[in-house]
Design a protein with these regions (language model features):
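Recognition helix of helix-turn-helix/homeodomain-like DNA-binding domains
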Residues: 28-42
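Short, basic-rich loop-to-helix N-cap that marks the start of a DNA-contacting helix
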Residues: 39-52
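Short, charged recognition helix plus adjacent turn
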Residues: 2, 10-11, 15, 35, ...
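Short basic helix-loop element that most often maps to the first helix and adjoining turn
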Residues: 6-25
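Conserved hydrophobic/aromatic packing and binding residues within compact polymer-binding modules
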Residues: 22, 33, 61
């Protein structure tokens, strides 16, 4: 299974919030946001900070998706 942060990006769009604002409010780095943009894993501490800043549960910012391998 792979991680997807598409829910987070949609939430930011719905709230008309820029990534820079999230970085400031959650106290996370631009590097972390870049990793999330590539659907790479980040620590639960980071996810907790984002959830706290947005006042949402973790399921509202990420999901696990099937990891398809090409043959």
């Amino acid at each position: 299974m792979a991680v997807s942060y598409n829910k987070l990006w949609k939430l930011l769009i719905d709230r008309k919030m820029k990534k820079k604002e999230l970085i400031e409010q959650a106290g996370i780095s631009r590097t972390t946001i870049a990793k999330m943009g590539r659907d790479e894993n980040v620590s639960t501490n980071v996810l907790s900070k984002i959830c706290g800043a947005l006042n949402v549960d973790i399921g509202e910012i990420m999901e696990m998706v099937p990891d398809y391998e090409e043959n």
